[in-house]
């Protein structure tokens, strides 16, 4: 049986901000059509890792990286069309990032920039993305309203809809639910479970219960290192990751005190 090529493959990845190394030689694979969880405390390198995957780190002054990142077996950093590649990898930040545009134009912005001009196509795509972000019913009668007029939680869902408008192959979510109420979070989690049928999802979260609900596999990072990786199907495995995390943090604090 031929082994399937991973959707994302990371090999001996290292990253720096200036002289400070923030990711220390980590390697892992992410399969197609899976939700892959990344957990860890603040400053563990999770967000920097996402930036290396969607090639935004190289636009950060003073940053550099070494190692391999592949998508479908091809070297991501060998792709000359950076913006074409980034279209394939959607990114949702922890807090909403709104464009000073209407709700409709926030979602239609990327498709238009990639050449979609047919209004019926745009209308259908805007509705689909807003539905996927659990926002359509709340805004369908005011699509001409500025997105910045929405509540914080609604703006975050608009950010998710905008990321989906790229029709990405990989969707990176960096603690997407931090600004969203629990009910809406559960709605979007249901959507993510459906989306994994058509894309790969990388979920950075500090909520272990969320990783347990969504991720097939989860890896734990600490101080830029990959500490543990494993299946998250069973509660005991997650609890073991937590136990090890608490032990590691305790010893780290003792060493630094």
Q: What annotation goes with each model-predicted range?
A:
Residues 171-174:
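Catalytic Walker B motif of ABC-type/P-loop ATPase nucleotide-binding domains
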Residues 74, 120-141, 254:
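Conserved ABC ATPase "signature" region
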Residues 166, 197:
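Conserved signature/switch motifs of ABC ATPase nucleotide-binding domains
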Residues 225-252:
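Conserved beta-strand-loop-alpha-helix hinge in the C-terminal portion
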Residues 199-204:
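Conserved H-loop
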Residues 68-84, 144:
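ABC ATPase NBD Q-loop/coupling interface
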Residues 54, 104-113, 123, 127:
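Short helical segment in ABC ATPase nucleotide-binding domains corresponding to the A-loop/adjacent helical element
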């Amino acid at each position: 049986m031929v082994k399937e090529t991973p959707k994302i493959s990371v090999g001996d990845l290292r990253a720096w901000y200036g002289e400070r190394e923030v990711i220390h030689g980590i390697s892992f694979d992410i399969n197609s059509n899976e939700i892959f969880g990344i957990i860890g405390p603040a400053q563990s390198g999770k967000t920097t890792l996402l930036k290396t995957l969607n090639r935004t780190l190289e636009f950060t002054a003073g940053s550099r990286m070494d190692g391999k990142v592949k998508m479908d077996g091809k070297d991501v950093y060998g792709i000359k069309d950076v913006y074409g590649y980034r279209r394939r990898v959607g990114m949702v930040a922890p807090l909403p990032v709104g464009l000073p545009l209407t709700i409709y134009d926030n979602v239609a912005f990327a498709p238009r920039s990639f050449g979609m001009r047919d209004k019926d196509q745009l209308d259908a795509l805007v509705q689909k993305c807003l539905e996927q972000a659990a926002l359509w019913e709340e805004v369908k009668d005011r699509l001409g309203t500025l997105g910045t007029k929405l509540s914080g939680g609604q703006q975050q869902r608009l950010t998710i809809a905008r990321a989906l408008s790229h029709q990405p192959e990989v969707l990176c979510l960096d603690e997407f639910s931090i600004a969203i109420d629990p009910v809406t979070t559960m709605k979007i989690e249901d959507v993510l479970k459906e989306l994994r049928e058509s894309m790969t999802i990388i979920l950075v979260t500090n909520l272990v219960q969320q990783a347990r609900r969504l991720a097939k596999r989860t890896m734990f990072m600490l101080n830029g290192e990959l500490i543990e990786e494993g299946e998250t199907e069973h509660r005991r495995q997650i609890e073991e990751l937590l136990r090890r995390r608490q032990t590691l943090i305790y010893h780290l604090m003792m060493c630094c005190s």
